[in-house]
Amino acid sequence: MSIYTERAVALFREGYNCAQAVTGAFAEPFGMSQEDALRFSEGMGAGMGRLRLTCGAVSAMALLAGLKLSNGKPNDLATRKEVYAVVQEMTKAFQEKNGSIICAELLGAARPKHETAQPEARTAAYYQKRPCVGCVEDCAEIVERYLCGAGKE
């Protein structure tokens, strides 16, 4: 397990959500403070605001691809194409390993019956019944494979 993957898993186990764990692990080498990364990615956790849509860790990969590869210029379609292509490749790698990118599907039987905005308490049972740590780990490994050493410095 690489230092980035270890950092992402540690952040998740500290109580940060899946998106925060992945963005937080890569923030500084990607030119952002960890505090800012944790703040700007919080809403993506639990499948975007606990809606159980696209996995927050997968969304974090897309955010990091933009941060690493985009120049932020609206008419630069070449970098936009590059970001989209890398996001598609990373998402495909995750889906091939996990069977889905949808939070609700990844949770399966572990999905709470009554969804609210209230996050669940992080207990031993929480970590035992959910695949989230593995999803965070997979996304960190994928980000490292596709984005570290690539793109704009």
For each feature predicted by the language model, list its residue ranges.
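Polybasic, low-complexity association/targeting segments
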Residues: 1-14
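Structural signal for hydrophobic packing residues in well-ordered secondary-structure cores
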Residues: 12-15, 26, 30, 48, ...
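Short, contiguous, pocket-lining structural segments
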Residues: 14-18, 32, 53, 131, ...
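Glycine/serine-rich anion-binding loops at beta->alpha junctions
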Residues: 16, 44-63
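Acidic-glycine-rich active-site phosphate/pyrophosphate-binding loop
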Residues: 26-43, 112-117
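Phosphate-handling active-site elements
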Residues: 29-39, 65-86, 151
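C-terminal binding/interaction regions
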Residues: 84-153
